[in-house]
Regions:
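Acyl-donor-binding surface of acyltransferase catalytic domains
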Residues: 59-63, 69-132, 258-260
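Short amphipathic alpha-helix that is part of the acyltransferase structural core
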Residues: 1-29, 125-158
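Active-site rim helix/loop that mediates acceptor-substrate recognition in acyltransferases
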Residues: 21-43, 152-174
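Conserved active-site alpha-helix within GNAT-family acetyltransferase domains
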Residues: 79, 98-115, 212, 235-253
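Conserved donor-binding loop and adjoining core beta-sheet/short helix segment
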Residues: 28-86, 180-195, 200-203
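Conserved acetyl-CoA-binding loop-helix of GNAT-fold acetyltransferases
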Residues: 73-86, 201, 207-221, 241-246
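Recognition helices and adjacent regulatory flanks at domain boundaries
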Residues: 26-27, 171-177, 183-188, 205-221, ...
Length: 260
């Protein structure tokens, strides 16, 4: 007999335990792109009676970006998943291919889908790219005006940028007094030591190998300082995929968007 299941909106901070269980259930961490969306989305408890058995997180655009159930309810996951879709008016779903529960639920419903991002979660070797005679230094507070005027492509506030600089997570390639590029790491979640890599190259200096060398620098930096790193890029960003692969990153997974 299927138990009575209900869905109840909740303040995320009131039930962080369910999210922690979800993160532990996955073989890999998700990137900062999704973590940022989670902070701006609606959190829903999934209940059996008055017992919390899982949760869903839905963006303001009605996209499901997280779905979790306790193991003892996996046998009725398709029923609960359909209930979530109907009750929360879900129009699309972001699913990481290493999230077997959500992937299976989506495939069972024969949804249309497309691959939207390539996810890099493994390193095959120490980067072979040499960075001799390639000047890289830590960003400092007095670099803020320059960075704020140049980094239009980075979705980052002044406060977020200052935080990365203070933690020594932001690095610059400046040559002949010109900012050619920068690379940085962001801690994906406060409770886990996992770092997402970001990069920016000045449009005037692109296609000159700067991005490859910046990635080599930051990957080596993370390895030397025991900072586990992950990365991802749009499926059509072939250039970035080649750079990551050249620097030893391996992609075994993707982010899929299922559409209803």
């Amino acid at each position: 007999m299927i138990p009575q299941i209900s869905i109840q909106q909740e303040d995320y901070k009131q039930n962080e335990l369910s999210r922690i269980k979800y993160i532990y259930s996955l073989p890999h961490f998700q990137e900062q792109l999704l973590e940022i969306q989670i902070g701006e989305s609606n959190f829903y408890n999934i209940l059996s009676g008055d017992i919390i058995i899982g949760h869903s997180i839905v963006t303001k655009e009605n996209r499901l970006i997280e779905f979790y159930l306790e193991d003892q309810y996996i046998s009725i996951c398709n029923y609960i998943f359909a209930l979530v879709i109907f009750d929360l008016n879900i129009t699309s779903i972001y699913c990481k291919t290493y999230n077997s529960l959500l992937l299976n639920c989506c495939l069972q419903l024969n949804m249309k889908y497309e691959v939207v991002r390539t996810l890099f979660r493994d390193l095959s070797k120490t980067p072979a790219v040499t960075i001799n005679d390639f000047p890289v230094r830590s960003a400092e507070k007095n670099d803020l005006p320059l960075l704020l005027s140049c980094l239009n492509d980075i979705n980052m506030t002044k406060e977020e940028l200052e935080k990365l600089i203070n933690k020594n997570y932001f690095f610059l390639n400046i040559d002949n007094n010109e900012l050619k590029g920068c690379v940085y790491i962001c801690k994906v979640h406060d409770n886990w030591d996992v770092y997402d890599i970001g990069i920016w190259v000045n449009p005037e200096f692109r296609n000159r190998g700067i991005a490859t060398k910046l990635f080599s620098f930051i990957i080596n930096h993370c390895m030397e300082n025991n900072l586990p790193s992950i990365c991802g890029c749009a499926i059509d960003n072939i250039a970035s995929q080649k750079i990551l692969t050249k620097n030893g990153f391996v992609s075994k997974h993707s982010l899929i968007e299922f559409k209803l």
